[in-house]
């Protein structure tokens, strides 16, 4: 590296840009490097925070490419990009992924903002969020130029960058100054805390971390957040950035709660607790498909929260202020299910109400109908439901004229409907109508990264409900819980936390002596191979019908056209990578 001989426009405001880099790294959980037009490092984080002001070596081909072409450069797999050929560091490159965005001032590229992954987790983070990060950094770059360079007001306009960054986050964010007064708060945080901006900006606020060692969760920690006469318990991360504290909420524990047994009245996307990759993908998918009127099929084992997902989709849709009607097809006797769904008119049959009855489908008009355990619906009713979906009308029992209905149907099952179709237990044509948008929920055993976060979530849920003191939890207990197979999924974990809240002495720590015997016996056993439920909605080999296979082939072809990575295709379809390659070979899609 060499010292720069002339000071660039970016280098003139280097302290501000360094602050900007640290903010960006904290928000996106990636390394950041910013260089000027002379390839001098203006700012950086981690290993890229060294040698500021010095010119980078000739191996900086990616940065040089962005400067010369004035275009964005993306590398999701290091060493395989053509620009990496001939690089001295190619075989030992620490950069696993790269996203470089040009800083354009008056048609001149004056620098590059780059996001860098140095771990496999960060590499997946970039790949999973590529479009969002690209748009995000491009937007920030525009503001960066217009407010910092053209206005030459670095001191004042850093606030505008802060505000833009946090407003574009789906996490709740609070930023306080060196006097602990709230300086910024984004819409997600306002919504979560139930306050309006004018009632919290400028107010002194206190973050008091709980002291149990085991409360740390992948860098998150429980905090008592207090302002005015209010106190809230929130799990999140607190970052110090040059005189400011930036608090990133993982989730809030004091308002409407995620409940498996009893879903909240108004669930939102952030109440799907989890930060593992599959849960992040699930939340993004729900956000994308919620506005659509198309039918959704939610597939998942018992206890994975299928109704919570259905309610979240409804609350994010344009039907949010309309009815959400839920019915469990397995919980109602077959002879009563038709009248519950379709209703009946006065005198329709012996024992009928004198006034008749409005069916649940009609009650859901203009809103959402959630059909849980759809696989248990009798075949006769399946035909009637199909007619209602296709004609957008229902015929109550005993009625002579149909009633028009406008509903969105979300169905759910923990069964293999493809097998049911092959056995003649489920109508193939109804499956097509209901499975327009398939969503697969992961079992808890595949979410080990989220176990500790969920443990604290349910602990707070039950201590608050039972009026108990919040307990600590020993690290070895958390490890046992991570290794447990959780056949009951979230419902089982919630019930266990309720049990522990009841038996732990007030104010003490939950240790392994309090765990039920079945957890101690099974918690450390190796997990056996299991058939993924996620394949249930896609793997239709056993159905035996050409139409089903054609549908499967089309789904795979369309997914392949949308993604460059087979891993991304498999993730979207909810199947394993080996299964995907098997299907590609079967349907001769190798050149797609």
Curated annotation (Swiss-Prot):
Classification via SMART domains: AAA (SM00382), PAS (SM00091)
Amino-acid positions noted as binding ATP in the UniProt annotation, renumbered to this chain: 300-307, 364-373
Disruption phenotype: Deletion of the gene abolishes urate-degrading activity.
Domain Sigma-54 factor interaction: 272-502
Domain PAS intervals: 158-229
Keyword Nucleotide-binding: yes
Molecular-function GO term, any one: ATP hydrolysis activity
GO cellular component: protein-DNA complex
A Gene Ontology biological process term: positive regulation of DNA-templated transcription
Keywords assigned: ATP-binding, DNA-binding, Nucleotide-binding, Transcription, Transcription regulation
InterPro entries, per the entry: AAA+_ATPase, Homeodomain-like_sf, HTH_Fis, P-loop_NTPase, PAS, PAS-like_dom_sf, Sigma_54_int, Sigma_54_int_dom_ATP-bd_1
Keyword Protein transport on entry: no
Pfam family, one: Sigma54_activat
DNA-binding positions: 567-585
PANTHER family, per database record: PTS-DEPENDENT DIHYDROXYACETONE KINASE OPERON REGULATORY PROTEIN-RELATED, TRANSCRIPTIONAL REGULATORY PROTEIN
Function per UniProt: Essential for both formate-dependent and formate-independent uric acid degradation. May be directly involved in the transcription of uacF in response to hypoxanthine, xanthine, and uric acid.
Name listed for the protein in its UniProt record: Putative uric acid sigma-54-dependent transcriptional regulator UacR
């Amino acid at each position: 590296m060499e010292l720069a001989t002339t000071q660039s426009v970016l280098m003139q405001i280097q302290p501000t840009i360094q602050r900007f880099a640290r903010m960006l790294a904290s928000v996106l959980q990636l390394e950041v490097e910013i260089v000027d037009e002379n390839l001098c490092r203006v700012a950086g984080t981690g290993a890229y925070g060294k040698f500021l002001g010095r010119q980078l070596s000739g191996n900086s081909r990616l940065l040089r490419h962005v400067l010369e072409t004035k275009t964005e450069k993306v590398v999701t797999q290091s060493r395989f990009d053509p620009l990496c050929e001939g690089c001295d560091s190619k075989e030992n490159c620490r950069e696993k992924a790269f996203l470089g965005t040009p800083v354009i001032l008056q048609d001149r590229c004056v620098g590059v903002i780059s996001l860098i992954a140095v771990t496999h987790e960060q590499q997946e983070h970039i790949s999973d969020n590529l479009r969002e990060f690209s748009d995000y950094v491009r937007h920030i770059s525009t503001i960066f130029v217009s407010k910092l360079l053209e206005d030459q007001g670095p001191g004042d306009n850093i606030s505008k960058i802060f505000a833009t960054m946090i407003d574009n986050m789906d996490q709740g964010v609070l930023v306080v100054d060196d006097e602990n007064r709230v300086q910024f708060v984004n819409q997600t945080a306002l919504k979560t805390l139930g306050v309006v901006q004018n009632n919290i900006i400028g107010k002194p606020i206190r973050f008091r971390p709980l002291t149990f060692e085991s409360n740390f969760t992948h860098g998150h920690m429980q905090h008592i957040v207090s302002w005015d006469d209010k106190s809230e318990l929130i799990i999140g991360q607190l970052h110090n950035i040059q005189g400011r504290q930036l608090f990133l909420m993982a989730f809030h524990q004091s308002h409407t709660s995620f409940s498996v047994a009893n879903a909240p009245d108004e669930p939102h996307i952030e109440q799907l607790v989890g930060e593992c990759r599959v849960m992040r993908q699930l939340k993004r998918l729900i956000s994308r498909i919620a506005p659509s009127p198309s039918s959704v099929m939610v597939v998942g084992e018992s206890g994975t929260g299928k109704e919570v997902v259905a309610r979240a989709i409804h609350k994010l849709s344009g039907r949010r202020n309309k009815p959400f009607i839920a019915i469990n097809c397995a919980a109602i006797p077959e002879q009563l299910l038709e009248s519950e769904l379709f209703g009946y008119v006065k005198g329709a049959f012996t024992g009928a109400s004198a006034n008749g009855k409005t069916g649940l489908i009609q009650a859901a008009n203009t809103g959402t109908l959630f059909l849980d355990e759809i696989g248990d619906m009798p075949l006769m009713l399946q035909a009637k439901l199909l007619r209602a979906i296709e004609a957008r009308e229902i015929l109550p029992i005993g009625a002579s004229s149909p009633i028009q209905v406008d509903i969105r149907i979300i169905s759910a099952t923990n069964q293999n409907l493809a097998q049911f179709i092959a056995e003649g237990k489920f109508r193939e044509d109804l499956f097509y109508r209901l499975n327009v948008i398939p969503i697969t929920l992961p079992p808890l055993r595949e979410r080990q990264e989220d176990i500790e976060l969920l443990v604290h979530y349910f602990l707070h849920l039950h201590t608050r409900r039972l009026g108990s003191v919040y307990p600590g939890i020993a690290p070895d207990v958390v490890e046992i819980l991570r290794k447990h197979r959780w056949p009951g999924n979230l419902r089982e974990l919630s019930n266990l936390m309720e049990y522990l809240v009841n038996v732990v002495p007030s104010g003490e720590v939950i240790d392994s002596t309090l765990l039920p015997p079945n957890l101690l016996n099974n918690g450390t056993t190796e997990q056996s191979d299991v058939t993924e439920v996620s394949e249930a909605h896609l793997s239709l080999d056993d159905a035996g019908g050409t139409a089903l296979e054609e549908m499967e082939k089309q789904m795979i072809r369309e997914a392949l056209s949308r993604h460059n990575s087979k891993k991304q295709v498999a993730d979207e379809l909810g199947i394993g990578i080996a299964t995907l390659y098997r299907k590609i070979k079967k349907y001769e899609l190798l050149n797609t």
